[in-house]
Amino acid sequence: MKKGRNYIKTALFMSAFFLMSNMLSQNDVLKLLPGSKKANYYESNDLLKLEGNVHFEYQGNTMYCDSAYYFEKRKIVHAYGKVHIIKERINMFCDSAFFNGESERAKLWGNVRVRDLDYRLTTDSLEYISTSGRAIYRNYGTIRKNGSNEQIVSKIGYFYPESKNYFFSDSVVYTNDGIRITTDTLSYEYSNQKTIFNGKTHIRKDSMKMICNYGWYDTKLNKGYLHGDASYEDSSQVLYADTIRYDEKIQEIIAKKDVHLINEENNFVLHSNFLYSSDSLNLTYITDCALAKLVQNKDTIFLHGDSLFIRNDSIEKKKNIQAYFGVKIYNKDIQSVCDSLWLSQTENQIKLYHNPIVWSENSELKGDSIVILTRDSIIDKIYVYQNSSAIMELDSGLLYNQISGKNIIAYMKEGKLNKTDVNGSAVSIYFPEDEEKTDSTTTIKRMGLNKLISSTLSVYLDSGEVVGINYVNEPVGIFYPMDQIKEKDRWINNFKWNPALRPKDEFTLTDR
C-alpha cells in the first residue's frame, strides 16, 4: 500500500459558479465603464449595443469583451469576442457568453477558461442553471491545479455549489504526481473530501494497480473501498476479492468474499473469504475457507485451517505461518492433520500440535507433537514426540507393521519413508515376508508376527515393509507363526488407523 493524499480542492468551482449565481439573482442594471468605443441604444428593441473594448459592470461583476448586447427588460446579456469576467479573485474567459436573468441560465462558449489562484478549468462550453444550482460541461473539460501536476479530465461534468457535490462522467481520468485514476463516473463530496466511482475503475501509482467496478476513496483520511471484481497489485503480490477496504495511512487492507492473494516474490498463494493485512504489524490473517499454497522449487504444500496468520521475514523474504483449528496439509509426499500448526520457511520447519497425524504412502505417524524438517524445499525428516507411533498398512489393510516408543525420528528419501529411529520404550511389530519359488512363479507369503522390545530401535523400511532392524541393547523378541497369532498380540498399545481423516487432495482441503 502506498501513502499519498490525492484529492481535489474545489475552491475554483465553488467560486466560479457562485459568481454566475450572483449574476443571475441580483437586480442591478448594467453600468458602462470607460473604455468602450461605441454604445448605441435601440429603444424599440430595448437593446443597448456596445462595441470596441467593451468594459462594464453587471450585477457586481466586471466584464470585458469586444461587443455586448444588453436587453434590460428581459434581463439578457450577450457578450462576444475575448470575453473576460472578473469576480474578486476569479477570472473567466470565453469567446462568447449568454446570461438570462428570467430563466436563470447562463452559458459560456468557445475556449472556456475559469481560473483562480489555485485551479483552472478549460472546456468547450459551460452551462449554469440557477434553479437547480447546477453547472454543466458536456464536451470534455480539464481541471488543473496551478503549480502542480494534479489534473482531472472528463467528457461531462456536473457541479452543485450549494450542496458542494460534483460529478464527472464518460472517460474520466484523474492524474497527480504519478497516480492515475480512470473510470466511467466519478462523484466528489466536498464536505468530507470523498470521491465515489461507478463503473470499471483503474487506479495506478508507481508499481501499484487497483481495479474495481465501483467504490469510494476518502481523500482526507486516505481510506478506500473497492467493490465488484476488485483487485490490488503491487510489485510483489496481487490481491483479488469481491470487496477490498484499504487504509493507506496505517497500511491496512481488508478483503472479503472470494479472496485470492498471489505473492510471486515468496511463491505462495492464499485463498479465503476474509483477509486482513497490516504492513505495520507485518501480518496477514485469513479465515473462512482459508487455504495457503506454498510453492518451493518443484514441490507444493497446501495448508488449510480455520484461521491462518502469515508473517513476513523481510530480510530473507520468507513466510512464517500459524494455523489454528481443523488444520490440514496436503503434499504429494505427505499429508497431515492437527489442531494447530507453526510453519517457518526461514527455519525450514513445520510444527504440528494437538492430535497430529502425518501420512506418507501407506504409513501413518502419530504423537503428542510432530516436527517436519525440510532440506532444499524437500521433506527430509519427521520428529514425533511423546506417545509416538508409526503404522504401515500391508495387504490392503489386512495387516499392519507397527512401531511405537517415546520419540520417533522418521527419515524420508525421495518422498518415501525409509527409516525410523525409536528412542525410549521401543516396540516393533511386523510381519516378515518369505518367497516361495516354483518353476514359473514366485509367491510371497507372510511368515508370521515378529515383536521386538528394546530401549532403542532403528527400523529400515521399503514401501512399508520392514527390511532391517538395528539395535544397541539386545532386544526382547518373540515370533508367532501366522496361525498362532493372538488378537492382543497383533497391536501396539492404543493402536488406531485413521484413513478417513487423511486429506485426499488439495481441492477438498476446505471441506468440512
Locations of regions flagged by a protein language model:
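N-terminal amphipathic/hydrophobic interface segments
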Residues: 23-512
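Bacterial Sec-dependent N-terminal signal peptides
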Residues: 1-31
